[in-house]
């Protein structure tokens, strides 16, 4: 099973927007692209929204059937580990192996020494085709990389081989994720992480490193654009080298997590993947849930009241909602409007404050990030929330489709 060159993860917290998401992708594909939709949902999201992996499979299959989509599509068991993978085995065909929590864990001395010995041919000045400067590789560097990443790649191997036994070799896509950590992986670290994965028999088709800068949820990239550009291109060159040198799948590509709304770096990624003829996987989820709230606000009446209630409850539960996402949000509490202020907002004011239009006078990234992590508030409302999604499906669907196509795919693929 092979992933298409270009793919987009389209998470959907409440499984009501699959058709609208797919419409956006089909619209982009009319330009000659072949973007594969990947419906992704994590175990944490399933727990918060009281759903099951089978619900995601049904949503994907139903959307594809309703719209007559003929391309490849996938269902991603997002951010799984050995303790959570089993419930996804039957319905997923794409597995994101999250091994970030194993970074820095101790490996046996003998394993580290064996890895260092296997890298002898790369010692000294290592030239990566296309890279401006050679990489300096020595035993100290390799020991540090092994100490940091060997346990994580071993964990990836254990999850992969469990899945291989359960599903059969070649019957699923493997992604390895190391993004939910504080410190970015450098291109030279990525190179030897890829060697470890190859040595351990993990045929990763996508890898999600932690990039330089901040990838906060639902808002634009924050960081040194010049540094990101350099590292992103070097990562792409490292992947090319790893395919030829280590025998990894030739279609391996970078996966960008928390990838929605990073408008300032989309042109950079587009330029680099075009220059080197490489693929890309962009993972999104919360941006669609935010469009549901925007759509409800635009509907007015009970929809607007629901949106205001969700914000009020989110503000009250702010600490517990933000805690699981501490590494990927930055909210200035002094910039959050009061519940009383929001009560007086019109549909347009609420939608414009939440919608990600950089430069719009009403746009508030703090408000947006809080709503982003507040989907549990809506989940706890149960049918009260989902009934309104169905009642206002047309306006919400239009918001979702516009967001994925106009603000994401058009920017990312220069449409």
Which ranges hold each PLM region?
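Glycine-rich tight-turn/loop motif centered on a GG-T
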Residues: 111-126, 130, 134-147, 216-231, ...
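Hydrophobic "anchor" residues on beta-strands that sit immediately upstream
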Residues: 74, 175, 253
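Conserved, mostly hydrophobic/aromatic
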Residues: 78, 176, 257
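Active-site capping/gating regions of soluble enzymes
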Residues: 1-59, 65-67, 83-103, 108, ...
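A generic local structural motif
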Residues: 61-62, 176
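Short, well-ordered beta-to-alpha junction loops that form the rim of enzyme active sites
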Residues: 178-180
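Short, conserved phosphate-binding/catalytic loop or strand-edge motifs used
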Residues: 170-174
């Amino acid at each position: 099973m092979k992933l298409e060159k270009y793919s987009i993860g389209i998470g959907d917290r409440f499984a009501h927007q699959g058709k609208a998401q797919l419409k956006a992708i089909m619209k982009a594909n009319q330009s000659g692209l072949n973007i594969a939709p990947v419906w992704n949902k994590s175990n944490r999201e399933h727990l918060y929204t009281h759903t099951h992996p089978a619900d995601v499979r049904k949503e994907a299959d139903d959307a594809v059937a309703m719209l007559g989509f003929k391309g490849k599509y996938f269902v991603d068991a997002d951010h799984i580990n050995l303790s959570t993978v089993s419930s996804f085995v039957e319905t997923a065909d794409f597995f994101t192996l999250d091994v970030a929590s194993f970074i820095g864990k101790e490996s046996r001395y003998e394993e580290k020494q064996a890895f260092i010995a296997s890298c002898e041919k790369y010692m000294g000045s290592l030239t990566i085709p296309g890279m401006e400067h050679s990489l300096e590789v020595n035993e100290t560097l390799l020991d540090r990389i092994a100490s940091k990443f060997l346990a994580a790649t071993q964990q990836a191997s254990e999850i992969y081989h469990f899945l291989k036994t359960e599903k059969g070799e070649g019957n699923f896509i493997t992604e390895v994720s190391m993004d939910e950590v504080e410190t970015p992986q450098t291109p030279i670290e990525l190179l030897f992480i890829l060697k470890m994965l190859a040595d351990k028999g993990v045929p990763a088709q996508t890898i999600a490193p932690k990039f330089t800068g901040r990838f906060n949820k639902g808002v634009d990239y924050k960081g040194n654009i010049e540094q990101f550009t350099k590292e992103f291109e070097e990562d792409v060159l490292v992947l090319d080298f790893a395919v030829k040198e280590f025998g990894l799948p030739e279609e391996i590509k970078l996966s960008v997590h928390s990838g929605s709304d990073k408008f300032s770096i989309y042109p950079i990624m587009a330029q680099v993947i075009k220059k080197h003829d490489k693929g890309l996987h962009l993972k999104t989820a919360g941006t669609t849930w935010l469009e549901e709230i925007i759509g409800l606000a635009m509907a007015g009446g009970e929809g607007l009241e629901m949106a205001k209630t969700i914000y009020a409850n989110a503000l009250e539960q702010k600490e517990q909602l933000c805690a699981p996402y501490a590494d990927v949000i930055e909210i200035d509490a002094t910039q959050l409007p009061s519940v009383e202020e929001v009560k007086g907002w019109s549909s347009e004011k609420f939608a414009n404050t939440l919608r990600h239009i950089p430069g719009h006078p009403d746009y508030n990234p703090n408000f947006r990030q809080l709503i982003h992590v507040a989907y549990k508030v809506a989940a706890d409302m149960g049918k009260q929330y989902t009934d309104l999604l169905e009642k206002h499906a047309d306006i919400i669907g239009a918001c979702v489709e516009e967001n994925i196509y106009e603000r994401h795919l058009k920017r990312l693929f220069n449409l």
